[in-house]
């Protein structure tokens, strides 16, 4: 039996199937109890509808002309498709007589259609711009019918092969999406209809509640190839999801939470993308188009594909709004530049790195022209807003961090407007950070702020010497910052050469100490003394120090050395032995003062002095003991008879029989919060206190090379004796303990220099319990 191609009306096939069923029933009802029981390669539900039967199959092969409608690769599959009608009562010929030629034609067409619907994953999608015909069959450029299948690109979904009712609520849409996504995850190839969620309603849906956790994980499962065009995601939460090759055209994503959401290879044209302010991490767009899409001013567009803008009008939003073009994207601007708008739109340093400045700048360099144009439009808006200096002041740093860099420096309009802003920013930096350390520079600061400061010093060379504290910090961080570019380092080195040539600086560098010892810098090693800070009070005074020393003094740790520098007067090195570090920093180099004082407050040695020498009874002596801790060497000596007698009177009650009295020992434990501490912890503290009193008795503080106050030596030895009783294990050996004890008292011919004892004990403590030593020993003695 043959039928022509003209016999098939694709648009009426569903009705033809209904008529066919009626026809079969009419032809078989008078004693002919036959039913169709098997249709090869067709859906089970269709078999069930026609299921009957006994034997004597009659087969109808699909006509060759219908087969020829399809590509050659599909013929083998179609050849296998046979319609078998079993056990029609009466003879085969009688059965044939009851089925008309017209009905056979209808059966062929209907079953062919059903076969196609269930074999779609076996066909290649060959649509070349042709609109789909009803039922998923289309006509290609050569007018040959083709079949849509599961690999249909998301931007051109074909119509559903079977009419299905759309979900009626967001919950139903969510259930349908969950089912499709899980089938895709299981490896099933979805048809275009399966992935068609156009006009869907996902409002208020939290996707983490309907999808497995694997879809929210880093490098987890992906929602791939779905069509969400013209859908609603308002107030939904799509955080941490990855949409790949998806279509969102004309969709609404207002107030959607999309923290760390990834859109890749997707079509997001004509979308309202004003995501919720509760979005913590910005969404990312990788090889994604956003033509005429409205974007919030706090987006990262580093992977967006820009195209030429069309003549479309700005989008309409509730409450109105101003907009600027960024390529073919729309960026929202404030209606008025109020104080809140300035902070919200421009201050990324206050808003977790998010601002309209960073949004525009996030585009790749290949879009430089579009970036500059958008920034110029932004500057015009700011200029039109007539903002005061006070209003701009909080965002000066954010503005220069972006606009003072290429490609925006190429714009005369931007340069003219930014010039005064950058000058005010630089003046504020000089005022703020000349006498205090700069914040530890992170990547942002190294790449965006340090180059601006270099440029400002280059324009204002006098500031190099008038604000030597800030200038040296900037050079330090440029030379040591791991995220600084080679260009930044080269410019910093060149500027420092200009600084060294200044008449206020050059006298201090030709003394055989600076840099590589010949008056020039040596940036090959951080140990070279390359930095020279000028006194803030006396132009004849300077401090020379290395990169490592400058870094540690600006950001100290408990074991930082505060005397590892050269103090220069008229270019000559002078001793710091008689100089109090705190006074030196307060008067000449205040950039170190705050850090020094902060470390000093963590040293608790003074608490023991207050126990022994109360300010009420021994005010003058208390001040002498405290003042001595602020310098390496003291000019005050306590070896005269009156001083020795007074000290003996004070310390005798604390040392009955040469040992710590139980009451005084408990006072010490209480003062240092050691009452419940382990014996070893108590011993370590007493050992370090002994070290400090050994220093008091030495020639460096209250003693001389030939004499020292006996009461101080005896008290130091008593502290050490108690530490030995508590925990001998903290000592190097019993022999060393005995040696130190003999030196305190001059027994057995031991050399009685307590400076040697103090240094030896201090080295041991620094090696084995440094944190305890650092919490007690005065900074000037460390």
From Swiss-Prot:
Enzyme Commission number, as recorded: 2.3.2.26
Pfam family for this entry, one: SopA
Modifications the protein undergoes after translation, according to the UniProt entry: Ubiquitinated in the presence of host E1 ubiquitin-activating enzyme, E2 ubiquitin-conjugating enzyme and ubiquitin.
EC class of the enzyme, as a word: transferase
Active-site residues from the entry: 753 (glycyl thioester intermediate)
Region (Disordered): 137-171
Gene3D superfamilies referenced in this protein's UniProt entry, alphabetically: E3 ubiquitin-protein ligase SopA, effector protein (NleL), HECT-like ubiquitin ligase, Putative secreted effector protein
Subcellular location: Secreted; Host cell
Functional summary from the UniProt entry: Effector proteins function to alter host cell physiology and promote bacterial survival in host tissues. This protein is an E3 ubiquitin ligase that interferes with host's ubiquitination pathway.
Name of the featured protein: E3 ubiquitin-protein ligase SopA
Organism classification: Bacteria, Pseudomonadati, Pseudomonadota, Gammaproteobacteria, Enterobacterales
């Amino acid at each position: 039996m043959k039928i022509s191609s003209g016999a098939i009306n694709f648009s009426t096939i569903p009705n033809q199937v209904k008529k066919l069923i009626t026809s079969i029933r009419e032809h078989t009802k008078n004693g002919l109890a036959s039913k169709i029981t098997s249709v090869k390669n067709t859906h089970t539900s269709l078999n069930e509808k026609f299921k009957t039967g006994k034997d004597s199959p009659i087969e109808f092969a699909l006509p060759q002309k219908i087969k020829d409608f399809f590509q050659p690769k599909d013929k083998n599959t179609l050849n296998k498709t046979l319609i078998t009608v079993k056990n029609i009562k009466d003879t085969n010929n009688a059965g044939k007589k009851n089925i008309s030629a017209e009905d056979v034609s209808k059966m062929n067409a209907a079953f062919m259609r059903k076969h196609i619907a269930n074999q779609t994953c076996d066909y290649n999608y060959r649509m070349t711009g042709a609109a789909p015909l009803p039922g998923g069959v289309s006509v290609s450029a050569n007018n040959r019918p083709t079949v849509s299948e599961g690999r249909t690109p998301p931007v051109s979904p074909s119509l559903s092969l079977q009419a299905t009712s759309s979900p009626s609520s967001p919950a139903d849409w969510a259930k349908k999406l969950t089912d499709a996504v899980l089938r895709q995850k299981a490896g099933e190839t979805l048809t275009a209809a399966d992935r068609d969620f156009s006009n869907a309603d996902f409002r208020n849906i939290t996707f983490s509640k309907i999808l497995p956790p694997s879809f929210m994980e880093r490098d987890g499962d992906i929602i791939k190839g779905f069509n969400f065009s013209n859908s609603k995601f308002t107030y939904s939460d799509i955080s941490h999801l990855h949409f790949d090759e998806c279509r969102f055209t004309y969709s609404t994503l207002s107030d959607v939470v999309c923290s760390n959401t990834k859109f890749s290879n997707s079509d997001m044209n004509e979308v309202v993308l004003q995501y919720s302010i509760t979005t913590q991490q910005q969404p990312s767009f990788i090889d994604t188009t956003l033509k005429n899409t409205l974007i919030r001013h706090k987006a990262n567009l580093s992977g967006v594909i820009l195209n030429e803008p069309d003549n479309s009008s700005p989008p309409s939003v509730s409450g109105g709004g101003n907009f600027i073009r960024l390529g073919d994207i729309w960026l929202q601007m404030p209606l008025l530049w109020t104080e809140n708008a300035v902070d919200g739109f421009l201050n990324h340093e206050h808003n977790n790195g998010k601002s309209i400045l960073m949004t525009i700048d996030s585009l790749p360099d290949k879009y430089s022209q579009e970036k500059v144009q958008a920034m110029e439009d932004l500057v015009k808006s700011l200029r039109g807003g007539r903002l005061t200096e006070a209003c701009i002041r909080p965002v000066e740093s954010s503005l220069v961090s972006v606009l003072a860099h290429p490609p925006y420096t190429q714009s005369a309009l931007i340069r003219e407007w930014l010039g005064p802003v950058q000058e005010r920013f630089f003046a504020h930096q000089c005022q703020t950070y000349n006498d205090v350390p700069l914040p530890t520079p992170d990547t942002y600061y190294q790449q965006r702020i340090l180059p601006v400061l270099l440029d400002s010093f280059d324009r204002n060379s006098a500031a190099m010497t008038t604000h030597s504290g800030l200038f040296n910090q900037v050079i330090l961080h440029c030379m040591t910052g791991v995220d600084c570019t080679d260009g930044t380092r080269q410019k910093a080195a060149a500027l420092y050469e200009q600084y060294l040539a200044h008449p206020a600086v050059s006298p201090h560098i030709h003394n055989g100490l600076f840099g590589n010892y010949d008056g020039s810098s040596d940036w090959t090693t951080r140990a070279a003394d390359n930095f020279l800070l000028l006194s803030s009070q006396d132009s004849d005074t300077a401090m020379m120090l290395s990169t490592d020393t400058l870094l540690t003094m600006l950001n100290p740790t408990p074991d930082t050395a505060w005397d590892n520098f050269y103090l220069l007067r008229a270019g000559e090195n002078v001793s710091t032995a008689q100089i109090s570090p705190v006074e030196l920093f307060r008067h000449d180099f205040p950039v170190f003062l705050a850090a020094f004082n902060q470390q000093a407050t963590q040293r608790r040695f003074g608490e023991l002095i207050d126990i022994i020498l109360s300010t009420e009874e021994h005010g003058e002596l208390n001040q002498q003991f405290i003042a001595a801790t602020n310098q390496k060497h003291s000019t005050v000596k306590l070896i005269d008879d009156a001083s020795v007698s007074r000290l003996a009177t004070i310390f005798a009650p604390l040392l009955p029989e040469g040992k710590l009295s139980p009451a005084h020992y408990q006072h010490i434990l209480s003062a240092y919060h050691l009452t419940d501490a382990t014996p070893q912890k108590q011993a370590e503290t007493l050992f370090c206190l002994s070290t400090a009193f050994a220093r008091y008795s030495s020639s460096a503080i209250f003693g001389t090379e030939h004499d020292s106050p006996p009461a101080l030596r005896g008290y130091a030895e008593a502290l050490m004796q108690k530490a030995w009783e508590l925990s001998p294990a903290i000592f190097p050996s019993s022999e060393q303990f005995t040696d130190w004890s003999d030196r305190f008292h001059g027994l057995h011919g031991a050399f009685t220099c307590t400076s040697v004892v103090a240094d030896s004990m201090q080295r041991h403590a620094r090696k084995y319990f440094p944190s305890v030593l650092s919490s007690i020993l005065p900074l000037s003695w460390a």
